[in-house]
A protein has these predicted regions:
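Bacterial N-terminal signal peptides that target proteins for export
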Residues: 1-11
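Pre-active-site segment of Zn-dependent metallo-hydrolases
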Residues: 40-47, 70-113, 124-129, 182-186, ...
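Conserved beta-strand hairpin/beta-sheet module of binuclear metal-dependent hydrolase folds
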Residues: 48-101, 189-215
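Mobile, glycine- and charge-enriched loop segments
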Residues: 106, 121-136, 190-195, 199, ...
Length: 317
């Protein structure tokens, strides 16, 4: 990556200010309840299978989630090894891996859950080729950008806002959770991000399965509220990688942060993603595995290679 020196200085000094000012630059979100939007999907064929679901790791932050008739795609990135994405402010990053599935081989998608609008999460191929009528849920900032690109079924959420999705008799609730893409000062220069809680099933008080996706965030105080509002998380997908701007300023979790996130959110199982696909990722999966072992959490982590699938069953409440 190359960056003009004046811009480097600006970003670096802003980072230092953000580290010093901390939470002053971004007040915590204290809302008790967010806004609720709804999405009605065409009913699928056949009975709802609530017994078993799956998560397939495609690469970077892209996974396919299948459960109860829903097929959900997260942070779609289908560039190949050697391709570059633009990250803003003149920054680019090179992809080091290939996706496990080609874009053309995707199944029909019911919903895209997008943590934020960044080139390594919604790449130029996806921007050009994804059907404009595919429903997408993301931050309000991302929603505005997506609508400018012609996407017609976009829902923008702020923290604690919720999208209620129905597909025949199947029900899904997607709730946006807090996230911050780096130290406070730097995060102000980057796209707004969100985590998300996916609750499957008709009973909001006792979902059939509860999943947390961190998004590109550090472990900030606001995330402590996630397990308070959503106890009993069955599976967490954590965006790791220790991404560093110019190799200096950390803007996503590294291995140690990932373990801290597990300890805060307290999921029953965790799958690490977003860790080795781009050259801006500076913390390899081995860092996380080492920290997991040191913390005695090995039985709570599932490691997936690109293309591998984790299957789960309805949770017991």
């Amino acid at each position: 990556m190359r960056l003009p020196r004046p811009l480097f200085t600006t970003i670096f000094l802003t980072a230092l200010c953000g580290l010093a000012a901390g939470a002053q630059a971004q007040a915590p979100d204290t809302r008790q309840q967010g806004q609720v939007s709804t999405l009605q999907l065409p009913a699928g064929e056949g009975a709802i299978d609530a017994a078993q679901g799956s998560v397939q790791f495609i690469g970077t932050a892209t996974v396919l989630i299948r459960y109860q008739g829903f097929t959900i795609l997260t942070d779609p990135n289908f560039l190949h090894k050697g391709d570059h994405v633009h990250l803003g402010y003149g920054l680019t990053s090179e992809r080091k891996t290939n996706p496990a599935i080609a874009f053309d081989d995707l199944p029909p998608i019911d919903l895209v859950v997008l943590s934020h609008f960044h080139g390594d999460h919604f790449d130029q191929l996806v921007q050009k080729r994804l059907n404009r009528a595919v429903p997408i849920v993301s931050t309000r900032q991302a929603a505005a950008s997506l609508e400018k690109l012609g996407f017609t079924r976009v829902t923008g959420l702020s923290p604690w806002d919720r999208l209620d999705v129905s597909k025949g008799e199947a029900r899904l609730r997607v709730t946006a959770t807090p996230g911050r893409h780096g130290p406070a000062g730097v995060a102000a220069l980057l796209p707004k991000v969100m985590g998300s809680v996916l609750d499957f099933g008709a009973d909001p008080a006792a979902p059939d399965y509860r999943m947390y996706i961190s998004g590109d965030t550090l472990v900030i105080d606001d995330i402590k509220t996630v397990p308070e509002r959503f106890p009993g998380i069955d599976l967490a997908l954590l965006h790791l990688g220790g991404t560093r701007i110019l190799g200096v300023v950390k803007v996503t979790m590294d291995g140690k942060d990932g373990v801290r996130m597990m300890q805060v959110v307290r999921p029953k199982k965790t799958i690490p993603i977003h860790y080795n696909d781009y050259d801006v990722f500076k913390s390899p999966l081995e860092d996380f595995a080492r920290e997991v072992k040191a913390a005695g959490l090995e039985q709570e982590v599932v490691y997936l290679a690109h293309g591998e699938t984790y299957t789960f069953t309805r949770a017991k409440r």
